[in-house]
């Protein structure tokens, strides 16, 4: 796997996991050494910061990582989530609720 693919794999795993995940678990999934994964994660952090990306990679003690939205964009994210929450239920969703009740 190329470094670009390793970085992409880490992004995908962090995005899908949503919660902080241990370096060892990421290393196991990539079949890489934990130190290599830490170096890759630090590269991702730097890239996101340099690009002023809407996403950020956070590090938590002891040795966990998480992808999340950058705080600067929090208000906009909140607005879109509030809009989605107030959306009416689709006919299919109403049908499912009718079956459950």
Describe the predicted segments one by one:
Residues 1, 74-85:
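Short, Lys/Arg-enriched N-terminal segment that forms or immediately precedes the first helix
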Residues 1-8:
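Phosphate-centric recognition/catalysis
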Residues 10-15, 88-101:
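Short amphipathic alpha-helical interface segments
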Residues 16-22:
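Short capping segments at the starts of secondary-structure elements
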Residues 25-29:
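A short acidic, leucine-rich amphipathic alpha-helix
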Residues 33-43:
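Short amphipathic alpha-helical interaction segments
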Residues 43-75:
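Charged low-complexity interaction tracts in eukaryotic proteins
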């Amino acid at each position: 796997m190329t470094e670009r693919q390793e970085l992409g794999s880490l992004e995908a795993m962090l995005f899908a996991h949503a919660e902080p995940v241990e370096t060892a678990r990421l290393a196991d999934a990539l079949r890489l050494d934990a130190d290599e994964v830490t170096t890759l994660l630090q590269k991702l952090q730097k890239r996101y910061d340099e690009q002023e990306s809407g996403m950020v990679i956070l590090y938590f003690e002891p040795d966990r990582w998480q992808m999340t939205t950058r705080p600067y964009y929090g208000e906009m994210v909140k607005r879109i989530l509030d809009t989605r929450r107030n959306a009416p239920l689709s006919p299919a969703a109403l049908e499912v609720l009718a079956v459950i009740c």
